Amino acid sequence: MKRLIPIIFTLFIASVSFAQTTTKPAVTIYNPKANAQADIDVAVAKAKAANKHVFIQVGGNWCIWCIRFHDLVNATPALKELLDKNYETVLLNWSPENKNEAVLKKLNYPGRFGFPVFLILDGDGKLIHTQNSAYLEEGSGHSVKKITEFLKNWNYAALLPENNKY
C-alpha cells in the first residue's frame, strides 16, 4: 500500500499537468492604448462632413454588457446599417489600464450611469445626449427594438427643425 500511494499521486499529477484547458480567448473590442480624444476628434470631423452624429460607446473589455451590445449590433444587419449610416462610432475604453479621465470629465462623467454608456455628439463635438444603456436592455441582453428607436431619435436628421413640426 505504501508503494501504491506515491504511484497514484504521481499519475494524478501527471494527468493534471497534461490535461488540456480550453479557455475562451479574451474579447478585445476596446483598445486601452488608444488616444480617445484623437479618435473622437477624427469622428467629429467625419460626422460634420457627412451630416452625421458621433456615437460613443464607453466601456471596457471586462464588461459583458459592452461585449453583448457590440456583438448584437454586428450580428443584426438592420442595427449595423442604421448605426453606420447615421453615426461615426468611437469605442472609448474605461478600464484599470486607461480610465480616460480627462476625456470623460469633458463628457460630464458618463460612467455614473454604468457601462456601457452611450454618448451622442453633434458635428461640432458638442455632447447632445447621454444614454444609460440599462433602458435599452431586455432579459439577458439589449433590445433591438429599443436600440433602433434610440438610434433613430438621436440621428442628425431627427434633430432638424423641418423634421419636428407638430
Where are these regions (language model features)?
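Thiol-based oxidoreductase modules, predominantly thioredoxin-like and allied folds used
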Residues: 34, 76-101
